[in-house]
Structures are given as structure tokens and as C-alpha cells.
Regions:
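A solvent-exposed, acidic/Ser-Thr-rich amphipathic alpha-helical stretch
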Residues: 4-5, 23-79
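Short, well-ordered beta-strand segments in beta-rich or mixed alpha/beta enzyme
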Residues: 35-39, 84-92
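Hydrophobic/aromatic beta-strand elements that line small-molecule binding cavities or substrate pockets
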Residues: 55, 72-77, 89-92, 103-109, ...
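Residue-level preference for beta-strand/loop junctions
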Residues: 69, 82, 86, 100-102
Length: 131
């Protein structure tokens, strides 16, 4: 398996874990001191503890549309030794039939033979979504 294939599989595993509610599985793919620019918050999240806090702050309105599908596509992956840069588009489908298009950039590092995300930046695309 190429590094690019392995990294892309891990990116997709994060989304699968999100849909399954498996935060431990997601966190296992993140470096302990990961940094995250979340689309819903302005501040930079630093580390798994603050990430867990961010998750708890997310609204839990049972009447709000829920995420039903995450379609990661169009990956552009560059690898330089033990560092990789991943850019992709994420289509988020909600239970009310609406969609959001998210642009995502993440940085990955290989440590002890495993690729872990060290930074993630997501941005809800404006201007009508996909061109």
C-alpha cells in the first residue's frame, strides 16, 4: 500500500468513526497534541482534551437535522518523507435533505510506522458549493 493510499484510508476512517459515534476510534487517528480549525468555532483547538470539550459544546438539538452521510472526494495528497499534506472536498448530507460542501486541509506525520493527523482545517465552502 502506498503512503497516499494509507493516509486516504485514515482520512475516510475518521469520517466513518464520526458517523458511528466512535470518538475513541477517531482520536486514535489523531496525534495527542493535534491542532484543529473547526468550521463551527473561531478559536484554534489544541490537543485531544480541548477537542473533547469542543465536541461537548456542539448543540445537541434532537429536532435539528443530523448528518446522514459524509462523502470525502477529490483528494490531493503530497508526501515528503514522514510528513504529508492532504486536501479534499467533503460533501455533508443532512437528514433534512440539505447538503454542505466543506473544503478540508490536513497535515499528517508518520511516527513509529503509523500516520496520524497533526492538524486539520475545515472550511464550509461559500459561493454555492461545488463549481
Amino acid at each position: 500500500m502506498t503512503d497516499e493510499t494509507e493516509i486516504w484510508a485514515r482520512v475516510r476512517a475518521i469520517y466513518d468513526g464520526f458517523l458511528a459515534g466512535d470518538t475513541d476510534g477517531v482520536d486514535a487517528l489523531l496525534q495527542r497534541d493535534v491542532t484543529i480549525w473547526d468550521s463551527a468555532e473561531f478559536s484554534l483547538t489544541r490537543g485531544l482534551g480541548p477537542l473533547r470539550d469542543l465536541r461537548r459544546r456542539r448543540p445537541h438539538d434532537p429536532g435539528a437535522p443530523a448528518v446522514t452521510k459524509l462523502d470525502a472526494r477529490d483528494p490531493v495528497i503530497d508526501v515528503w518523507g514522514d510528513t504529508a499534506l492532504v486536501r479534499h472536498v467533503l460533501i455533508v448530507e443532512l437528514s433534512d435533505g440539505t447538503r454542505e460542501t466543506v473544503r478540508n486541509t490536513s497535515v499528517w506525520r508518520r511516527a513509529e510506522g503509523a500516520w496520524l493527523a497533526v492538524h486539520n482545517h475545515e472550511d464550509i465552502a461559500g459561493g454555492g458549493g461545488l463549481p
